[in-house]
Amino acid sequence: MVRLTIDDQLAEVEEGATVLDACKAAGVEVPTLCYVPFLAPYGACRMCTVKVADNGSSRLTTACTLPAAEGMKIVTDDDDVREARKIVLELLLARAPDAEILHELAAAYGIEKSRFLAAPKEEAAPVAEGAPEFELEAKPKKCILCGSCYRVCEQRVQAFAIGL
């Protein structure tokens, strides 16, 4: 077992668990967008950013990709962590202004509008001649680039049919 401190609370998890696993085990809520329990950790969305405090210094990192280590001290909610998450949300909102999940999180973080410029409108890719008679509707203004579609296709279905 690995013991670590999360927001001044002792947590214990199995060897090989991530900091996100430890937070969940301790009942500490950490927001995620790209985390899918049955897929390998990815860290693309950066919403699970936490602070790792060590020997008087600290660094921000993703909880879903960081292996829990003995004696680790984790901070999940302070000014630095909140500011990092707010910037991530604003960037994602500029990229995907129609994504409802982003608006829910933005409201929780007090964000009404992104301060960053919106992404230019993406045109649909042309359909190749002789392509099958079906169409997958892409919604680029809703895509938050979490990689979940791609990773499920690759890791679970093993079709390797979707690219990022």
Predicted regions and their residues:
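Fe-S ferredoxin-like electron-transfer domains
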Residues: 46, 54-164
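N-terminal cofactor/phosphate-binding cores enriched in small/glycine residues
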Residues: 11-70, 84
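Eukaryote-biased recognition of intrinsically disordered, low-complexity regulatory segments
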Residues: 1-9
